[in-house]
Amino acid sequence: MKVSLPAFEKAKVLVVGDVMLDRYWTGPTGRISPEAPVPVVKISQIEDRPGGAANVALNVATLGGQVSLAGIVGKDEAADALTTGIQALGVEPKWHCVEGKPTITKLRVMSRNQQLIRLDFEEAYPEDESKALLTLSESALDNVAVVVLSDYAKGAITQPQEFIQKAIAKGVKVLVDPKGSDFSRYRGASLITPNMGEFEEVVGSVSSEAELVEKAQALLSEFDIEAILVTRSEKGMTLITADAPELHIPTVAREVYDVTGAGDTVISALATSLAAGSDLPQACAIANTAAGIVVAKLGTSTVSRIELIRALSVNHGESGFGAVSEDQLAYALEQARLRGERVVMTNGCFDILHAGHVSYLKQARELGDRLIVAVNDDDSVKRLKGEGRPVNQSDRRMAVLAGLASVDWVVPFTEDTPQRIISRLLPDLLVKGGDYKIEDIAGGKEVIAAGGSVKVLGFEDGVSTTSIIENIMANQ
């Protein structure tokens, strides 16, 4: 499926649900407390991020959509911090304030990119407070195209059926990020987005694709829901509707670093895309790409439009693979690193591509997720190899290399050595063929200094460009 991003700035979205504050206390730890067998963390940084439904709204705003956020908060410092955080990014708050209840806060203590403990500050809200919030939210229905119900089972959304009916009657799509085993509460919704665990909590265990589709179709019929998007971790997503074949979308995530807020990212990308005019399959593909980006980040995070553009160009081959310029490659590498991919780089003239080259490049690619081949341009080959070389011009050499399954990117360089371009791109692993010493490999010191590594691979015995040329000349 070719995926195109809509004009997100045209999207008008209302998010209703359980808002919370994600608070991070971060610092180094180097000793154990004398009071108990626990680490001592010396806090050096405190950061507040909008979480729950607030993170959904923040994701919509980061993509460029117009968004309002309705939620329940206490009259406390956490509510003030949450308000400041969302307003700074263009989200309009519509709070229902409750006396004597705290704003839901999740405090995480972090050290060395690891979460040591989480402390939750929350109390359940009475059902009357949920009714008051939904009544407050009805006033915004005339000005939006999509409503998101972000349910974390904290009491903000207890019985939303009447609200859903009013929204649908006004032509507003209602998307639900569900919680719990009672999907009857979301009767009449346009779309629900359970993960696989939430889906199986409702329908029982699922052992095959066919069973997943069958049970999803039954839910659609039972609760008058238009569509279900089941998020399935490493298996991607599956969209089931009543009037079309199921759509399986494979994951684009290469490495999962932190799943905090991933579900928020999915539904916010769906809502923004649909509100901006995308059809449902397109919106699901955009949401899948956004999820692949966010799980490679630490903590509750958002995804920007530019990140989506770069990810889609790389994942769908519109640009970013094959023969590229240095600047194009720099953008592609930035996205690859967001996905947690290990990048390998090698270089050479590759004047007459032979079996030894193919074997060597295959070995190099197997050491990581992506392989860059930097190629000497024609002038540098002539300086290094002498008159009569190269046999093949650089554009032809690059085209042949780019056609190999093992090669992701081919980039030219003009100098006699690739030191400058390696120093700019800084791969995770620099590979060189032959009998080099690691300390003599151009760019090796820079790669190691940046935290990468250098490796020497052997070539096939008796196979070289020089010997091939000599054999050709001898047989003329």
UniProtKB/Swiss-Prot annotation:
This is Bifunctional protein HldE. GO terms for biological process: ADP-L-glycero-beta-D-manno-heptose biosynthetic process. Pfam families: CTP_transf_like, PfkB. One of its GO terms (cellular component) is cytosol. Residues 1-319 are annotated as: Ribokinase. Homodimer. One of its GO terms (molecular function) is ATP binding. Catalyzes the ADP transfer from ATP to D-glycero-beta-D-manno-heptose 1-phosphate, yielding ADP-D-glycero-beta-D-manno-heptose.
